[in-house]
């Protein structure tokens, strides 16, 4: 009996000392975002500019330190050239709004990056970006139309098994803006939805009008594979305080990690567009 106990203790000691560290290293090495380089783009055109942008950037930089990836932050559209974009595994547009490119050559470089297999994470008012560029609006999944006033309401987790929903509540009650859009693209897969019945009633007429054919649930977070690339969008994150909230930080982190998991490599042989307005691939 004593020998048996010694054997079990030795086996346990072996697992803790030798096997556990190896397993931990394997987990770290296979974290897809580790050692990646991201472009965080913050440009806004004429119009409303969110005061959350610096806080969003700081939050992503802190996540980069914690999870071993790097970020380049820019509000200069000159970064959108083929040679420059090749440096990045995916792009993050955080609360961009209105026209964020200066030239159609920059728009074409962005489009070809997506076609080559690049990834895109869009945060909050990204749905109000490049409102006159049809291809971009399809890539995003919608274009902004209106939001209810800032208030506490509920967002429902529609796909809790999706990798980017890890640690996200089944029903998330938070203060934010409930975004609505138009020109919704049918390729998006909804991950979270605004629970419209949880909104304050004084704007109910405008809410019903903007919800269109949707009833009580309206898309808030979604993803899609689009034209060879990969897209993850959250309309949440209006307040600057959001970016220091642990639940929201995790929400953003899981979106970044999901996009990292989709990256293979850029292959510009698949980038066929010669104009920003070329038809979609057949």
Regions found by a protein language model. Give the residues of each.
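Bacterial N-terminal signal peptides that target proteins for export
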Residues: 1-10
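A short, well-structured beta->alpha microelement
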Residues: 67-80
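Extracellular ligand-binding/catalytic regions of CAZymes and related secreted enzymes
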Residues: 26-36, 62, 66-69, 204-218, ...
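Solvent-exposed loop/turn segments at secondary-structure junctions
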Residues: 44-47, 77-80, 96-100, 120, ...
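Catalytic beta-strand/loop cores that center a nucleophilic Ser/Cys/Thr
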Residues: 142, 147-227
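Glycine- and acidic-residue-enriched helix-capping/strand-helix junction motifs
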Residues: 45-57
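Bacterial N-terminal signal peptides
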Residues: 10-21
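Short alpha-beta junction capping motif
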Residues: 38-42, 86-130, 228
């Amino acid at each position: 009996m004593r020998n048996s106990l010694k054997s079990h203790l030795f086996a346990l000691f072996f697992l803790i000392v030798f096997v556990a560290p190896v397993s931990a290293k394997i987990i770290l090495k296979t974290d897809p975002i580790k050692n990646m380089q991201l472009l965080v783009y913050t440009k806004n055109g004429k119009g409303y500019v969110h005061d959350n942008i610096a806080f969003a950037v700081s939050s992503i930089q802190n996540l980069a330190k914690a999870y071993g990836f790097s970020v380049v932050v820019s509000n200069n559209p000159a970064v959108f050239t083929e040679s420059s974009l090749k440096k990045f595994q995916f792009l993050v547009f955080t609360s961009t709004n209105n026209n964020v490119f200066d030239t159609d050559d920059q728009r074409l470089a962005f489009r070809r990056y997506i076609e080559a297999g690049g990834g895109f994470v869009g945060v909050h008012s990204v749905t109000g970006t490049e409102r006159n560029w049809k291809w971009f609006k399809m890539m995003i999944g919608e274009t902004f139309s209106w939001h209810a006033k800032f208030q506490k309401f509920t967002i429902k987790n529609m796909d809790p098994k999706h990798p980017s929903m890890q640690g996200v509540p089944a029903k998330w009650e938070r203060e934010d803006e409930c975004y609505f859009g138009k020109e919704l693209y049918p390729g998006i897969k909804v991950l979270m939805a605004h629970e419209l019945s949880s909104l304050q009633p004084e704007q109910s007429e405008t809410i019903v009008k903007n919800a269109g054919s949707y009833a009580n649930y309206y898309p808030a977070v979604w993803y899609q594979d689009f034209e060879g690339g990969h897209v993850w969008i959250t309309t949440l994150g209006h307040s600057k305080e959001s970016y220091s909230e642990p639940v929201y930080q995790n929400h953003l982190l899981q979106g970044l990690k999901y996009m990292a998991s989709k990256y293979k490599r850029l292959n510009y042989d698949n980038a066929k567009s010669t104009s920003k307005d070329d038809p979609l691939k057949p």
